[in-house]
């Protein structure tokens, strides 16, 4: 299931807070990015969370599944048995708080409420907590560690803070998480799964052409399922730089990433172009040639042949089942020559003398 993203105007906090950690491999931090929407589309969650260990997403949660789940290489982390149950319990509490916030705001909406909670280890190994919140893409509230409560200048911040403080020990739980639970979890992850932070997955590549405006074609160079997220795509024309085109980039549900770049060229000129990709998972830059129609046709033919073979196998199996159910031998047994009579005699055919019952007493004259 695809988790919905915040509205374009509500992406400010996410885009502001995450790029620094995504671009720094040595950034030792544990961050939870939480999002709630007041009017979710049918079949989509009202609340979802992504958890990040440094540059890697390690956790996902949404209100439809109701379970915290590991992502990417962290699926194989040797964690204690109760760890994910604890994550699930904590995030269900956060879900309740975020949805309660909409009640405090009234029914004017729609609203998108986001939060960034977590901690970062400084060079001297001390923990620096983070607790920021945004409403419809604008930061409006934080958690004051000295006061032990939420605060901000907006009236909405006051309304939400008062609502949350009515929840049993909510402020105390927030303070405990930021000062103690978060740094403990971060150090545990670094101890148990430090190798995961060195995970490198090279991209699967494809360069395709499609018709564009009259007289032009659009080349799209696509990279699939790679990690870390830093990747460079560029086009060459006859070996010369032709630009980077217009790009797209995003995360996958398994913790890897995808990216693409498109370039408009003259029709008939497509085969003069190639795509060059650079990534930490590749020993050297990879040259990606344009996918030809012939290759696509071979793929389609292979799929068709595979379907036909599967269909033939299914039909043959059904016919064999009907034959054996009616008492007839399997075809390969009927073709075994001399063995036929001794194994399964053909219906209506007399047995050989050697096959008669030796215990039968001959009739007396």
UniProtKB/Swiss-Prot annotation:
Region feature (Alpha-1): 24-110
Modified residues (Phosphoserine): 334
Keyword line: Cell membrane, Disulfide bond, Endosome, Glycoprotein, IgG-binding protein, Immunoglobulin domain, Membrane, Phosphoprotein, Receptor, Signal, Transmembrane, Transmembrane helix
GO cellular component, one term: extracellular space
Disulfide bonds: 119-182, 221-275
Residues on Extracellular side: 24-297
Residue ranges of domain Ig-like C1-type in the record: 202-289
Matching InterPro entries: Ig-like_dom (IPR007110), Ig-like_dom_sf (IPR036179), Ig-like_fold (IPR013783), Ig/MHC_CS (IPR003006), Ig_C1-set (IPR003597), MHC_class-I_related (IPR050208), MHC_I-like_Ag-recog (IPR011161), MHC_I-like_Ag-recog_sf (IPR037055)
Transmembrane segments: 298-321
Glycosylation sites: 125
Membrane topology: Single-pass type I membrane protein
Region annotation Alpha-3: where it falls in the sequence: 201-290
Stretches of the chain found on the membrane's Cytoplasmic side: 322-365
Region span, Alpha-2: 111-200
Family stated for the protein in its record: Belongs to the immunoglobulin superfamily.
PANTHER family to which the protein is assigned, alphabetical: IGG RECEPTOR FCRN LARGE SUBUNIT P51 (PTHR16675:SF3), MHC CLASS I-RELATED (PTHR16675)
Protein name, entry field: IgG receptor FcRn large subunit p51
């Amino acid at each position: 299931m695809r988790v919905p993203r915040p509205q374009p105007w509500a992406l400010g906090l996410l885009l502001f807070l995450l790029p620094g950690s995504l671009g720094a491999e040595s950034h030792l931090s544990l961050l939870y990015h939480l999002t709630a929407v007041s009017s979710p589309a049918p079949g989509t969650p009202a609340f979802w969370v992504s958890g990040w260990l440094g540059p890697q997403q390690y956790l996902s949660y949404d209100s439809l599944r109701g379970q915290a789940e590991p992502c990417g290489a962290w699926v194989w982390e040797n964690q204690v048995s109760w760890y994910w149950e604890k994550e699930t319990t904590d995030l269900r509490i956060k879900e309740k708080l975020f949805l309660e916030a909409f009640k405090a705001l009234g029914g004017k909406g729609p609203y998108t409420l986001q939060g960034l909670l977590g901690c970062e280890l400084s060079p001297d190994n001390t923990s620096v907590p983070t607790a920021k919140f945004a409403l419809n893409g604008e930061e409006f509230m934080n958690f004051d560690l000295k006061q032990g409560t939420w605060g901000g200048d907006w009236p909405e911040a006051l309304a939400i803070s008062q609502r949350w403080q009515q929840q049993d020990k909510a402020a105390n739980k927030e303070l405990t998480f930021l000062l103690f639970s978060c740094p403990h979890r971060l150090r545990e992850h670094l101890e148990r799964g430090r190798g995961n932070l060195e995970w490198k997955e090279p991209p699967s590549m494809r360069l395709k052409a499609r018709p564009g405006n009259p007289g032009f074609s659009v080349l799209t160079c696509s990279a699939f399922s790679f990690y870390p997220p830093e990747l460079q795509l560029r086009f060459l024309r006859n070996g010369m730089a032709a630009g980077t085109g217009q790009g797209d980039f995003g995360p996958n549900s398994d913790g890897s990433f995808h990216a693409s770049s498109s370039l408009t060229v003259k029709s008939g000129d497509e085969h003069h172009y190639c795509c060059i990709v650079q990534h930490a998972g590749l020993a050297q830059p990879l040259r990606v040639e344009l996918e030809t129609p012939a290759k696509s046709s071979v793929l389609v033919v292979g799929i068709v042949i595979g379907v036909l073979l599967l269909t033939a196998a299914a039909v043959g199996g059904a016919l064999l089942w009907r034959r054996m159910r009616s008492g007839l031998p399997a075809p390969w047994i009927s073709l075994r020559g001399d063995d036929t009579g001794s194994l399964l005699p053909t219906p209506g055919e007399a047995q050989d003398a050697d096959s008669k019952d030796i215990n039968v007493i001959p009739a007396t004259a």
